[in-house]
Amino acid sequence: MKKSNFSNVNLSMGTGRRKSSVARVYIREGSGNIRVNNRDFDSYIQLENLRTMALSPLVLTNTLGKYDLYINVYGGGISGQSGAIRHGISRALFELDESNKMILRSNGFLTRDSRRVERKKFGQKKARKSFQFSKR
């Protein structure tokens, strides 16, 4: 997370992670354009609940139309990617304005969600599910 001066505009960067997804979020002042992997945000994340979850740090800090976001995200599925975007947006907002720290921290947006897929065990069908038991 570093702050740099890019073409006379204040640019802030945040890296977010969730499951196996990594998102690099670049924020600068603008009109509210959001681009994910050079695509429009609404066409990249098509499920409404995932869009709402990814943009919740902006809604919480009342900065939804004030910044342009450029996001590079890779790895994992769409749910993990939207969680990584949320984490990256939160970190970039904190880097841009440190007064957002208490709001973001109290809602858990600055904390990385460390839940991962549990591995499959041998002698079982899945991670927790066992094979069907036959008494006779």
From Swiss-Prot:
Lineage top rank: taxon: Bacteria
Q: Which GO terms describe its biological process?
A: translation
A Gene Ontology MF term for this entry? structural constituent of ribosome
Does the record carry Ribosomal protein as a key word? yes
Q: Name one GO cellular component term.
A: cytosolic small ribosomal subunit
Keywords, sorted A to Z: Ribonucleoprotein, Ribosomal protein
Which Gene3D superfamilies does UniProt cross-reference here? 3.30.230.10
Any keyword Ribosomal protein? yes
> What InterPro entries has UniProt attached to this entry?
Ribosomal_Su5_D2-typ_SF, Ribosomal_uS9, Ribosomal_uS9_bac/plastid, Ribosomal_uS9_CS, Ribsml_uS5_D2-typ_fold_subgr
Q: Which HAMAP family match?
A: Ribosomal_uS9_B
PANTHER family given in the database record = RIBOSOMAL PROTEIN S9, SMALL RIBOSOMAL SUBUNIT PROTEIN US9M
Read off the NCBIfam families from this record.
PRK00132.1 (NF001099)
Family assignment?
Answer: Belongs to the universal ribosomal protein uS9 family.
Could you identify this protein by its name? Small ribosomal subunit protein uS9
Which organism does this record belong to?
Borrelia garinii subsp. bavariensis (strain ATCC BAA-2496 / DSM 23469 / PBi) (Borreliella bavariensis)
* Gene label: rpsI
